[in-house]
Amino acid sequence: MKVCVIGSGGREHALAWRLSISPSVTKVYAIPGSAAMSDCAELVGIDWQQSDHLISFLKDNQVDLVVVGPEAPLVAGLADVLNKVGIPVFGPSKAAAQLEGSKVFAKNLMKKYNIPTAAYGVFHKVDEAKTFIAQIGAPIVVKADGLAAGKGVVVAMTVDEANEAVEDMLSGNRFGDAGSTVVIEEFMEGEEASLLAFVDGKTVVPMIASQDHKRIFDGDKGANTGGMGTYAPAPVLTDALRDEAMKTILEPMVAAMEKEGMPYVGCLYAGLMITDEGPKVVEFNARFGDPETQVVLPLLDSDLGQIMMACATGTLTADMVKWKDSSAACVILASKGYPETSSKGDVISGDIKQYDTTIVFHSGTKLVGENYVTNGGRVLGVVGLGKDLRTALDRAYGRIEHIDFEGMQYRTDIGAKAFK
């Protein structure tokens, strides 16, 4: 079958790469894709927002399935537009994508269906938010309601820091409409893990658990980012805890979405905190994580195209999804100034080819002449594969020694928590 991937980042590079080696897939298109994706997909210069052009292309080329990578097209309702004209989509409807698009929607739904998460309040006015902060005390978590590219969350260690975050979001207009409402949550103690699942509207099949590293610097210091590295499997989410998360979080949420009249199709991403009381929800995302995808998909031992089509057509079964008994680690190489700014146009030198045990996924690059240059905050995701995590990490970091660009920054402690 022919599959079209929407998006151009590291996650989409990983999706296109994995689909291109799936037996059921004969052709992969990418809209718009990136130059680096041309080794596994045909790039198509269409804007997904021009739905007439997009639909014409998909119909003319007899595309069987569309896989939407980023959150913005989902929250904008791209799946609805394509489903309406009979094109199967791996990705949720506009209504279902609110699970990521609105933190208030997600928190209220979790409360209604008793899905474990942090206690919270929702605020539009600065003074009311500050009163709540004074009552709860610090540490406390302040979140912008809408999409903020993974950066709309402040874990405030002091009341002053929390008040500043509230002012920044509600008065300072830091995230525009996304920050016109804030969710303030109790701080949860524990270790985070990402549990992604394939969903067809009813059936939920978990992927291998991974762990992201959100902060820019080693030791979880510095500003929040879109993610500086991941590894899988993550030992913090034992089989027993994964089963508990499925029973208390993912399965009830998918059942709730169906009951609410907005069945969920695609990848459901549960960001979890493993607390003393068991797994609790930090956030839901309505798509594959970036950079979780870069470690989860290389460990898949099944046909990704077949699984995604089954999700899109309501025919998913657990036996379709098998995993390799090995490990993967991804280290993000970011440009200078990230996450506050990003440097564009710095030439990337060294070896960025694909090998059996190391893969380089391009998050923010551009081909200028014969050279790739930086074109975003997160530039490359260097993935190491191995029989165990130590081997995978050694391969990823070993590969990084052969890659360079001006101001290149990365964390040296990805996966360290697994060896505690």
Positions of predicted regions on the chain:
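Active-site "cap" helix and flanking loop/linker of ATP-utilizing ligase/carboxylase catalytic domains
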Residues: 246-268, 285-355
